[in-house]
Amino acid sequence: MMPRIALTLAALFAAPALAQTLPEGPGREVVQGACLGCHEASRILRSGYGRADWDNVVHMMLNAGAPVPPDQVATVVDYLATNFPERPKPAAPSLPGPATVVFHEWAVPTPGSRPHDPLAARDGSIWYTGHMAGLLGRLDPRTGGFTEFRPPTPNAGPHGLVEDRDGNIWFTENFAGAIGKLDPRTGQFTEYKMPDPAVRDPHTPLFDQHGTLMFTAQAANRIGRLDPATGAITLVTVPTPRANPYGMVVTSKNVFYFDLFGTNKLASIDPDTMRITEYTLPNPASRPRRIAITPGDVIFYSDYSRGYLGRFDPANGKMSEWPSPGGPDSLPYGMTYLKGAIWYSEAGTRPNTLVRFDLATEKFQTWPIPSGGGVVRNMMATADGNLVLAESGVNRVALVEVK
């Protein structure tokens, strides 16, 4: 198993010391041998999952090379679901409002793919990164047909993705320390390795107005710039240590803003000078995770740790915030701007919610996600005024018609 995948899956299973405390039952020995030998964190064993979610987690492990015999997969899933069930979480709030939505959801072909980020391509297709299956996927929502593409580097951990002007799909290889490019017409991949091996986890990519690719690298605490014409990569370090740069947007003036998920700050960077400026949020407990931008260049962010929606106006420095409808444990996550509103999902409610915040009235509207959502890590607006979502924990992608 590759080291980066082992580190990522470390959050899924308990330390070897917990082997002595695992309950008896069919599947215990397989879990003990296949899981506890690698993984040290016990977070998810402590919190628990439902059976469908455990099935997805086990298939993510299989994609990463976990030695679970095929005839034992169902037994392992049953064992985990029985002994480590999902614990109560906040109920999804129901707030009425003026908008109407229709959800269309599709299960992706490869079990345990963990769709991480979606992309609404210009041709109407929906792309996604299969983070734990090491692939990119393309869905034709008109037919429901999928096509999967696998980069040359196995288990590269495709994470964020973006389309260039020529229709190529660029993506971050979060486990391989690289940026990838796919030409969908030919299926040909090109990979660009980080010049510094310490930058192992490029995260969110985004093009500037001149076709230069910018990206965050979370654990490495860097911001990167890649020139597609030459392949040259420039890296700069975020001033605050362990700040964990995460989501990213670009303004009409070609200035990039990004969240610093490891601290209570936002930041901006000039792609020409690579100079970074940080902006401290009022509450020290804030941990902004994803970010969205309005046509007027006003920044919104999901305050994941506190259950708030935040607003920052770079023009005057003013900051505002609103409690998310699901409460302090709602875990606001993936977000975007669409039709005069900020849209985002609450990952901490069951089921996950789709939330609409009307910028004119400052009122919320919510909908439960039919499949449960399974943590919507990112979403994107389509050119025709709808939304696409990646639903990691339920192994689905979604198109939300907004009426």
Residue ranges and their predicted role:
Residues 64-93, 124:
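C-terminal capping alpha-helices of c-type cytochrome domains
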Residues 94-112:
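A short helix->beta-strand "capping" segment at the edge of beta-propeller domains
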Residues 127-132, 169-175, 213-219, 256-262, ...:
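Conserved beta-strand positions in repeat-built beta-propeller and related beta-rich domains
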Residues 374-403:
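Blade-level signature of beta-propeller repeat domains, shared across WD40, Kelch, NHL, RCC1
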Residues 31-42, 76, 80:
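The canonical Cys-X-X-Cys-His
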Residues 111-123, 154-166, 197-210, 241-259, ...:
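Beta-rich, blade/repeat-based domains predominating
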Residues 15-30:
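Electrostatic cytochrome c docking/interface patches
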Residues 140-144, 183-187, 227-231, 270-274, ...:
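Short loop/turn segments that connect beta-strands within beta-propeller blades
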